[in-house]
Amino acid sequence: MILVLIMVILMMIFIVQSIAFITLYERHLLGSSQNRLGPTKVTFMGLAQALLDGVKLLKKEQMTPLNSSEVSFLLVPGISFIVMYLEWFTLPYFFDFISFEYSVLFFLCLIGFSVYTTLVSGIVSKSKYGMIGAIRASSQSISYEIAFSLYVLCIIIHNNVFNFMCKFNLSLLIVYIPFLIMIIAELNRAPFDFSEGESELVSGYNVEFASVAFVLLFLSEYGSLIFFSVLSSAMFFSFSILASFSIFSILIFIRSSYPRYRYDLMMSLFWFKLLPVSLIMLCFYAVVFYY
């Protein structure tokens, strides 16, 4: 019991540390894509930039909006971070001491629950911008999670297990491209970052958050980004550090290369293109592997 508790605490520390370096790596990649340097002024090659940014955020004052509950204003970002943290326990490659057989079902429950934290954070902020961003996030979640679950079911049928212990197989690569699109939508990353559209919603659902609350939302967002990069590597490439790093880099380059999609086009993409394709793929895998 004590050993498990120590491992859980160490894992949280490692996740937070990885987020610090990943944000620095992202800023350098975005700078390189625009033919400029990233942060280079703080210590050697800007290595302490992410750490000092975190300290600066923690020193900010948290102003609770009028007519909003201070407890819920801090509770919702905390729940968002816990949901992101629990997602990591579905990966048996790292956490054999706590993983279980039906981890895929637990993972689907977590990503279904994560949208409620976004929705409630927009509600408790008592801001029109935050509310619009939260509504967009919830409608986007309803659209993509159905197709996302069907693609995951295709992989379950292919491997005949309910966890993420998968081996590399070329037949799964036809699922990977739509799966990558689903991941971008799940993470609210460009070009599907409608819940945080800066040009129209200032910052979206997190516009009123600062200090510790904003740090928790930031950690949950980038922790999920790292998790889904590792998850894609585990599901399609037998878990490779190089594959995880490459997938994360692809997500960053997509952000730097493509403008924000139009909202109605995104909804039609999910409902009229990706969902029918996922149903066809599910029927195909079911027929091939069970009949």
From Swiss-Prot:
Its main location: mitochondrion. Changing I123V: In strain: BW287. Keywords: Electron transport, Membrane, Mitochondrion, Mitochondrion inner membrane, NAD, Respiratory chain, Translocase, Transmembrane, Transmembrane helix, Transport, Ubiquinone. Belongs to the complex I subunit 1 family. Changing I250M: In strain: JU793. This is NADH-ubiquinone oxidoreductase chain 1. It is found in: Mitochondrion inner membrane. Changing I247M: In strain: ED3092 and ED3101. GO terms for biological process: aerobic respiration. PANTHER family: NADH DEHYDROGENASE SUBUNIT 1, NADH-UBIQUINONE OXIDOREDUCTASE CHAIN 1. The chain crosses the membrane at residues 2-22, 71-91, 104-124, 142-162, 164-184, 211-231, 234-254, 269-289. Its EC number is 7.1.1.2. Core subunit of the mitochondrial membrane respiratory chain NADH dehydrogenase (Complex I) that is believed to belong to the minimal assembly required for catalysis. Complex I functions in the transfer of electrons from NADH to the respiratory chain. The immediate electron acceptor for the enzyme is believed to be ubiquinone. It is a multi-pass membrane protein. The gene is nd1. The keyword Ribonucleoprotein does not apply. GO terms for cellular component: mitochondrial inner membrane; respiratory chain complex I. Changing E101D: In strain: ED3036. It catalyses: a ubiquinone + NADH + 5 H(+)(in) = a ubiquinol + NAD(+) + 4 H(+)(out). Changing S244A: In strain: BW287, ED3033, ED3034, ED3035, ED3037, ED3092, ED3101, HK104, HK105, JU403, JU439, JU516, JU793, PB826 and VT847.
